[in-house]
Amino acid sequence: MKILVINSGSSSIKFKFYDLKIQKCLASGMIEQIGDEVSHSKIETCDGKTIEENMEIRTHDEGIVILNRYLKETGVLTDLKEIDGVGHRIVQGADYFEGPALVDDDVITKIEELIPLAPLHNPAHLSGIRSSLRHAPCLPNVVVFDNTFYHNIPDYAYMYALPYKFYEKYRVRKFGAHGISHEFVTKKGADFLGIDYKNFCVISLHIGSGSSISATKDGICIDTSMGLTPLEGLMMSTRCGSVDPAIIPYMKRVAGYLSEDIDTIMNKKSGLLGITGTSDFRKVLERMHKGDERAKLAFDMLTYQIVKIIGSYYAILPRVDAIIWTAGIGENSAELRESVSKRLAHFGVGVDETVNVNCIKKPTDISSQNATIKTLVIPTDEEYSIAKATERILLSLKK
C-alpha cells in the first residue's frame, strides 16, 4: 500500500509518503510558517530530488495543494489515485477512541468537540483532514491518535484528586501525549532484545522540545508523565512541566497577570527558555561548558526530573527490562543520557561511555557491561507508525 502521512500543525504541515509494500519512504517534506507573508515549503524524495520554495501560503488548504503538486512534480506519483490512503496524526482523541479510526462525519464531530482540550492542535488537524478530503475525495482518510496508547492506564493513575464532577462533566483527567512514539520504540525495543512484547517491562523517554516518560508493563502502558494537556510532567524547551498550581492565583494576585498570560508563559516562555533564555538544548550545553550557571541549573533540573520520574515508575513496575531513549534530545544527547544513568547506578543502570558517545541513527544498546537494566537508544518514527496503522484499518475494510 502507498500511504501519505500528514501531521498538520497550527502553522505547518509535515508529511511523508510511504510504499509499505517495499517498506520505503518515497518522499518527505514540510510546509512551514503558514499564514505568514513568506512561507517555506520543501519536498525531498528517496532518490534525491528536491523542490524548495519560499512564497505566501495563506491556509492549510493551499498547503495541501502544494503538497499534492510536489508529489507529482518530483515523479513520486502521476495521479493522486495512486495513493491508497491518507493517515493523520491527531494529538487529542480523549476517551472517544480506542484506536485509529476511518474518517467520517462522526469522527470529525468528535475531534471538534475535543478542541477545548487541544485548542492549538485539533483545529489544525481538522484543517488537514478537510483539505485532504476536499482535494482527493476518493481517498480514504484515517486518524491515528497520540493518546490511545494510554487507553488502559488504570483510573487511580489517570484521575486527579479534584471534585469528581470535573471528570464527569469536563473530562478532567490524564490523557497523555507522544503515545505513537512510545508505542513504536517500546515495540522496537522488545524486538531488538528478543523479548516477547507481552512480557516486556520498560520505561521509555521521549525527550525533545516536548518531553514525556511512560511506564509499560507487559506491553500495556500503565502511566505517563503528561496529563490533561502536554504541559504536565517534565520541564521542556518552552513548557514549565509540573508546578504548584497555586502559582497561578498567586501571580494573578501579586503581579496582576491574567489567566491567559500565565497560560502563555507556562507553555511558551518557560522550561529551558525560561531558565536560560534559549529553548535550544544544544545551546544550553554549549553555555554550560563555558561556565554559564543558568545553563548548568537547567541541565541539572532536567536530569533530576527525569531521574525522579524513572524512580517512581521503577516502583510501580514488577521489574524493568530496559530504559529507552528517543526523540531529538534523547537520541542525540550522550551527555544527558550519561548524567541520568549515573544517578540511577544503584538501580543497575549504566552506560558504556564509548558506545554512548558514538551512538548512531539505529537501535543501539548503550548499556555498560555490568548493567542489570538495559539502556537503549531507539530513533522514533511516528510517521511510519501512522502509515502502518492506516494500512491496518484499510486492510480491515477489505475483509
Curated annotation (Swiss-Prot):
Keywords: ATP-binding, Cytoplasm, Kinase, Magnesium, Metal-binding, Nucleotide-binding, Transferase. Mg(2+). Can also accept Mn(2+). The active site is at D146 (proton donor/acceptor). Its EC number is 2.7.2.1. SUPFAM superfamilies: Actin-like ATPase domain. Catalyzes the formation of acetyl phosphate from acetate and ATP. Can also catalyze the reverse reaction. This is Acetate kinase. The lineage of its organism: Bacteria, Pseudomonadati, Campylobacterota, Epsilonproteobacteria, Campylobacterales.
